[in-house]
Amino acid sequence: MIENAHLYCGDAMDFYDQWATPMTIVSDGAYGIDGFDGDLKNHEHLADWYEPHVVKWSELCGTFTTLWFFNTEIGWANVHPVLREHGWKYVRCCVWDKGMGHVAGRTNTRTLNQFPCVSEVCVQYIRGSIGNIPIQNYLRNEWMRTGLPLNKANEACGVKNAATRKYLTTDSCFYVPPEEQLAKLRDYANEHGNPEGRPYFGDEVVEQSRSGIDEMKRRMALRLPKFHCPADMTNVWSLPHLSGDECVRDENGKVLHPNQKPLEMMDMLIKSSTDEGDVVWEPFGGLFSASFSAVRNGRIAYGAEIDSRYYDAGMRRFDEKMREAVQIALF
């Protein structure tokens, strides 16, 4: 076993319950283009294919887990309603521009009826909910349950209007209150709110805890999405398609996996949405690029690959890459 890498051969559905709570999930599964064994013939049934996985992600993720969802444009369009239904909040559609090298020598522009495709999308979502309730709705609903006027929330927080304008608003000005302010809302609501509705802003874990503020801080940490944006990055990633030594090939020299992602891209995703020690899931591992990136950057990886050929190749690659990393560190 490789330290901090928990990689399984089989269907991720059989392993999710054994995995630690993820800070980030990197999904690179079926595309509906018949691109590999197990892929669907077209995009029409992708929503059904992904839904069982989305259900488990939603059940087991943290309150503000980040999801990176790779697919084609039409594939993502088919799966987006399922993600939204299960509480995932859309953040940004990123485009991987693979460059002309991706189609050079493989397209005949005289016979094409559309532009050659050199891109795929990677869509960023955050969980943004408590259970299946978006946190924005949860906070406002809890306050409304108290029967107190909204302006009393400002009094509770000791602010002029930040509570009503930001913490309890229904519009785009919303942001999650700092833990100290959330604790003030909770205490005020439970002291002055309708006694029949108590407790407010709490769950069984919080209510049973004798250190309510510490528990609130712990829960707040799970509610805040992590994102560290490099100064030179946008939502268009111009990275050439894989070739050379990084591209894994079979014994005949042919590309082994048609959907292998560049490690440079995986590093960017992992570093931008996690910190050292965080957990990363890769449910459709392929050659485990996201998992390797996670481990070499000090994260903990959980992944699965259903095709034993890809799994074995991915494990060999993982082991080789880790040995290389150790040698580099020694010298």
Give the location of each predicted region.
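Core catalytic lobe of class I
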Residues: M1-A304, R309-Y311
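Positively charged, low-complexity nucleic-acid-binding target-recognition regions
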Residues: M1-I2, C157, D319-F331
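Conserved SAM-binding loop
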Residues: G314-M315
